Amino acid sequence: MSTSEIISRVWGGVLYMQFHLDRALSNQECPSFYVAVHRNSYLHNSLPAILQFFKPFLKDARLAQSQKWWFEFEKVPLKWNFPVGLLYDLVTTDAQVEKQMWEITLKYYDYPIEYVIPIDQNPSFLKDHWTNQLKEACFILNGSSKLVMNMSRTDSDDFYHAAIHKDSTQFESMFRKLLPSSVSSLKNLPIKVYLPLSNKLIQPVLSNLGRKITLGNLLQDLIPDLFPSSLMYTVAHPYSHGVVLPLDSSIIDLYICMKSLDGFLHISIKMIQKNEH
């Protein structure tokens, strides 16, 4: 499969979701809202459509104008600043994945500020977050975020529009402008590795990217207890966009093909269950 085909599949991946309205927000029986949500997006991208559906059932219809809604899955608050697919890979088990429908509760009161970043009422809060992530990714790649900071307003708006509307061709065209001209000029790669159970996040520091570093090499160096072999899965699997990543893949190639809309390659680690051996 070519690089462009993989990128197209990454951007085309969806999750089938069922949203329930928190019972405290309505005085009547409320149907669920069903929708296919792109993995490579944010939950709040879908909020306008969700609220439009639930507005007739709200005790206080004025709440539909607010952005300070939050989402919960099996009593676990979901981080709005994570891509949808990453959230799903982090919080679901194999048994839940088999259901093929992700059930989420839409909530408003008792915002979990100890776990989820508070939402600014500024209408551009999501774009501001995305831009900050892109600046960080650019800094990791180049040692400077100037390429993002010096973008014209038009280019910045077009870039965000491409990300939010899943225009992978336009997104890739603009993202290539942030990449160094050669592999030897890469300072590092924007990668985040999420460990199971502990909610711990690791951002590896890579050096000498001129040589081929495989995902197996990276994970064996970072977390040898979970990846004692750089060639075989023995304890855990690395996931991104819902698929198990091959350990022999070049980490640079993986980044180019499977980075998310925020410019990072997100890798979630899941323990291998006994029945998988």
From Swiss-Prot:
Q: Briefly state the modifications made to the protein after translation.
A: Conjugated to ATG12; which is essential for autophagy.
Q: Any idea which UniProt keywords this protein has? A: Autophagy, Isopeptide bond, Membrane, Protein transport, Transport, Ubl conjugation
What membrane topology was assigned to this protein in its record? Peripheral membrane protein
Source organism of this protein record: Pichia angusta (Yeast)
- Keyword Iron (UniProt): no
Q: Establish whether keyword Ubl conjugation is in the entry.
A: yes
Job of this protein: Involved in cytoplasm to vacuole transport (Cvt) and autophagic vesicle formation. Autophagy is essential for maintenance of amino acid levels and protein synthesis under nitrogen starvation. Required for selective autophagic degradation of the nucleus (nucleophagy). Also required for mitophagy, which eliminates defective or superfluous mitochondria in order to fulfill cellular energy requirements and prevent excess ROS production.
- Gene Ontology CC annotations of this record: Atg12-Atg5-Atg16 complex; autophagosome; mitochondria-associated endoplasmic reticulum membrane contact site; phagophore; phagophore assembly site membrane
User: Member of which family?
Assistant: Belongs to the ATG5 family.
Taxonomy, superkingdom: Eukaryota
Quaternary structure note: Conjugated with ATG12.
Any one GO MF term held by the record is: Atg8-family ligase activity
What this protein is called in its record is Autophagy protein 5
Matches recorded under InterPro entries: Atg5 (IPR007239), ATG5_HBR (IPR048940), Atg5_HR (IPR042526), ATG5_UblA (IPR048939), Atg5_UblA_dom_sf (IPR042527), ATG5_UblB (IPR048318)
